[in-house]
Amino acid sequence: MMKKRASHHLVICTLIDTLRFRLSSRKAISMNAFNKLVKHSKKISNFNHLSSIVGWDQAAVMPSGGAEARSQAMAELSVHIHGLMTQPQLADWFAEAESETLNIEQQATLREMKRQWQQATVLPEALVEAQSLAGSKCEHAWRSQRKNNDWAGFEKNWAEVVKLSQEEAQIRAEATGKTPYDAMLELYEPGTTTEQLNRVFSDVKTWLPSLIDVVIEKQSSESFIAPKGHYPAESQKALGLDVMKLLQFDFNHGRLDESVHPFCGGVPSDVRITTRYNESEFVQSLMGIVHETGHARYEQGLPKHLAGTPAGEARSMGIHESQSLFFEMQVGRSPAFIAHLAELAGKHFSAMNDPVFRVENIQKLYTRVQKDFIRVDADELTYPAHVILRFEIERDLMNGKIKHTDVPELWDQKMQAYLGLSTKGNDQNGCMQDIHWTDGSFGYFPSYTLGAMYAAQFMAAMKKTVDVDGAIRRGDLSPIFAWLSENIWSKGSLFSTDELVKQATGERLNPEYFKNHLKSRYLD
């Protein structure tokens, strides 16, 4: 997950910046309106820099006793940023800037600044503060409540988060003429609608369940050796760091830590990624690091000359997830990359002769399909079912068709329908398992499967000009990263998602690439 603090109001604020404006000093200012807005953007970006690092600290290293004071501090900061974001003079600056002569890059920067400003100005300051407080409280308590399967305790805090999120969704819907859920989607996937997602996901539901069953049956006759023993966290971290080096992560501008829920946070110049270790196996944490490194490389590769402005940020969360899933699924699970993982793992665990670390065995471990409860541990094939379930619930929750108290039962029903599993009485492995909803990140989940689809499409396009398998076998992935940099990373948010994908691949999102990728990997 890319940790865009789902206090989206804060994230949204992230993009524009402040200028203490006094009418009496107008004549002393020589900058045109566009440059004022850019300066404004960079100043608020600095505040959000601090907010992002503090958010990482809260998730990774803050002692439990610091939660209440931290919540107050974060709420104060979010209110401050929101106030800067909604200063009255910004409307005049936008009006003036639109009449100025701007180049294509400047026009895109202005467009994105205005879009983010419009999203921020619809929310009253009191709501922003209330959401920050409720989200911090709910998220912190969730960390222990999930462990204890304490739905009753979680529900008391979550009720307020949902109420405030529904209020936000309604305000945004009235301002934009969208449905409440579409208005929330716009925060993560600009231009994407529920209608589009319903169409894409409905198609997936026609072929995914049967494909899952066919692959599980096919793999039932295949033998593999599951990791058994003790894999020290220190050794797992050292292994992860070596893999990050292979993926050319810039350690001068980032680091790896631990947290309850893996994420990528920080800022492009200081990217913080986390994972979690289970000393009885190493498979999940290792590929989790590969996933978060994909997020991090995207952040580190964003256009530096646009830093501090919306145009210099990631295009959408779907594109962000496409990069993490490109690393994890397209590259990370390829036979050539698995060969590197097998060698490195055998070295770090001093078990080069252990059959667990044979290339073919590691390959089977990373392409094993099974129906499971946990999204973050799900395999590539069953993962979309987890996403579709969440999409359908949060869509109906934000549109007021269901109540938050309905969620556990609905979750159980959908898990049984899509994966044949029941979560009745097991909410810690059901509706309480994700961090997203604890602070109101409704609308984020579709980004994961959209990202998987974009990633498959990017790989298909890349292979037309790049010897991908050869680069991975050689252990020099530079040609792969050069393609991503040229076609995705360096373009930030200069183009719409549709246009970005079309420029890179020759067409807009085409889910057939994802379907073909899955069939090729798991049936051929």
Where do the language-model regions lie?
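A well-structured
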Residues: 30-190, 519-523
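Short, Lys/Arg-enriched N-terminal segments with co-localized hydrophobic residues
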Residues: 18-30
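Post-HExxH zinc-binding segment in Zn-dependent metallohydrolases
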Residues: 313-353
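C-terminal, non-catalytic "cap/extension" segments appended to globular domains
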Residues: 33, 52-55, 65, 69, ...
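Active-site recognition of the HExxH zinc-binding catalytic motif
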Residues: 284-300, 321-325
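Polybasic, lysine-rich low-complexity intrinsically disordered segments
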Residues: 3-4
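Contiguous, non-catalytic segments that form substrate-binding/exosite surfaces or channel walls
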Residues: 131-282
